[in-house]
C-alpha cells in the first residue's frame, strides 16, 4: 500500500545519500484518458488494462526498483541511480513512455493507451543537508507529471521549480474565478455577428 511504499522510499533515499554518489528518482506515471476506457468499455476491461500497464512498467525497471499503484490510474516508481549517470533514468523514462504506448487488446477490444510521466530526484531537492521525504518526492513528481499532460501527454518531464510556481498560479486563478462567479463579479459582454452580405444579425460571440 501507499504507506509501506513511502516508508520503503524514505529508507532508499537515506541509504543512497550515505554513499555520497547515489540518489533516488521518484517516477509518477498516469494513464492518459483512463476514465474514458472505463466509461466506454467497463470496469473489467479497465482493471485488465491496469494489470497490463503494471506488467509493462515492471518490465522496464531494474530489479531493485520499487513499484506501487497509488491511485486509480497512477503508478509510482522509485529507482536508485548513480548521480553521474542520470541519463540512465532518462532511458528508463523513455522506455516507460514507449512500452505503455503500445496498443492493448483486452476482451477482444483494441485500446490505444499512453501515459504522462513526471520525475523528481532526491539529490536536487535536498536543502541544507536535509533529505526530501517520500511525500515531497511524490508531490514534485506529480507536478512534473501534470506538466507532461499540459504539454500533450505521452511524454516525460523532470521536475523544475517553475512548474510548481505555474501550478500554484493556476490553482489560485481557478480559485479566484470560482469565487468571482459565486459573488456575481463577472459580467459577460457579447459582440454581434453580422452577415456582411445582408447586414443581418446572425448571432453573438
Model region roles, listed by residue range:
Residues 190-205:
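A short, well-structured catalytic beta-strand-centered motif of the EAL phosphodiesterase domain
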Residues 23, 135, 154, 202-205:
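Short beta-strand edge/capping elements of PAS-family sensory modules
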Residues 14, 95, 172-185, 200-202:
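Structural alpha-helical segments in enzyme catalytic/regulatory domains
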Residues 39, 80-81, 150, 161:
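Short, conserved catalytic or interaction motifs in soluble domains
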Residues 48-49, 76-98, 110-111, 119, ...:
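Short helix/loop segment flanking the catalytic signature motif in cyclic-nucleotide metabolism enzymes
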